[in-house]
């Protein structure tokens, strides 16, 4: 989120930086070259983004279905981690315990927290 705001601020700032020389008397010799609808839209978007951030609302103002496909989070089907029954363990092998379950849950599935893994394994 912070990176997007920084990029937007840089875009708005750099859009106002290109200057053209103005030879009109009584005016500053430099004036912004870019006073387009695009610059106004960027400023308006930044204002809305900062206002939403101050209100604690999500930063993306568009509906999820209107986002570009690369911006959508892929739906990942996570395999169910379960504790095997005692009967499934071959004789002579160590029985699967809660700590092993939590360990493999944490390293095997990206994005799971310790609390999620503990809840699933117990």
UniProtKB/Swiss-Prot annotation:
Tissue specificity of this protein: Expressed by the venom duct.
GO cellular component: extracellular region
Keyword Disulfide bond annotated: yes
Keyword Transport: no
Basic and acidic residues biased stretches: 62-85
Disulfide bonds: 101-121, 105-117
Compartment(s) where it occurs, according to its Swiss-Prot or TrEMBL record: Secreted
Disordered: annotated span: 53-91
Molecular function in Gene Ontology: toxin activity
Propeptide feature ranges: 23-96
Keywords (A to Z) from UniProt: Cleavage on pair of basic residues, Disulfide bond, Secreted, Signal, Toxin
Signal peptide: 1-22
Entry's family note: Belongs to the conotoxin R superfamily.
Domain comment quoted from the record: The cysteine framework is XIV (C-C-C-C).
Name of the protein in its database record: Conotoxin flf14.2
Record lineage: Eukaryota, Metazoa, Spiralia, Lophotrochozoa, Mollusca
């Amino acid at each position: 989120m912070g990176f997007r705001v920084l990029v937007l601020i840089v875009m708005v700032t750099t859009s106002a930086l290109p200057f053209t020389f103005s030879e009109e008397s009584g005016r500053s010799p430099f004036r912004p070259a870019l006073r387009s609808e695009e610059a106004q839209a960027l400023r308006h978007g930044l204002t809305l983004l900062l206002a939403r951030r101050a209100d604690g609302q999500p930063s993306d103002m568009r509906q999820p279905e209107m986002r570009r496909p690369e911006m959508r989070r892929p739906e990942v089907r996570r395999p169910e981690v379960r504790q095997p029954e005692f009967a499934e363990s071959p004789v002579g092998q160590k029985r699967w315990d809660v700590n092993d379950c939590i360990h493999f849950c944490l390293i095997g599935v990206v994005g799971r927290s310790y609390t999620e893994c503990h809840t699933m394994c117990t």
